[in-house]
Structures are given as structure tokens and as C-alpha cells.
Amino acid sequence: AKYGMAIDLHKCAGCGACGLACKTQNNTDD
């Protein structure tokens, strides 16, 4: 499954925190 998030990609610093938050929120490891 693919998940979408409402984030401003222009402010993205590539830190990966959004991906970690997404995994935590959706209880998934993939």
C-alpha cells in the first residue's frame, strides 16, 4: 500500500522524519 502525507516538499530537508512518523502512524515497517 502507498500512503500520502500533506507535507510541504519545498521545506523538506531530507531528514527522513516524515517517513519515520508515517511508519509509526500506520504501524508498518515497510
UniProtKB/Swiss-Prot annotation:
Binds 4 [4Fe-4S] cluster. Keywords: 4Fe-4S, Electron transport, Iron, Iron-sulfur, Metal-binding, Periplasm, Transport. GO terms for cellular component: periplasmic space. [4Fe-4S] cluster 1 binds at residues 12, 15, 18. Induction: Fully induced in the presence of arsenate. This is Arsenate respiratory reductase iron-sulfur subunit ArrB. [4Fe-4S] cluster 2 binds at residue 22. Heterodimer composed of one large subunit (ArrA) and one small subunit (ArrB). GO terms for molecular function: 4 iron, 4 sulfur cluster binding; metal ion binding. Component of the arsenate respiratory reductase (Arr) complex, which catalyzes the reduction of arsenate (As(V)) to arsenite (As(III)). ArrB is probably the electron transfer subunit. Its cofactor is [4Fe-4S] cluster. It comes from Chrysiogenes arsenatis. InterPro entries: 4Fe4S_Fe-S-bd. May also use zinc as a cofactor. The keyword Isomerase does not apply. It is found in: Periplasm. The keyword RNA-binding does not apply.
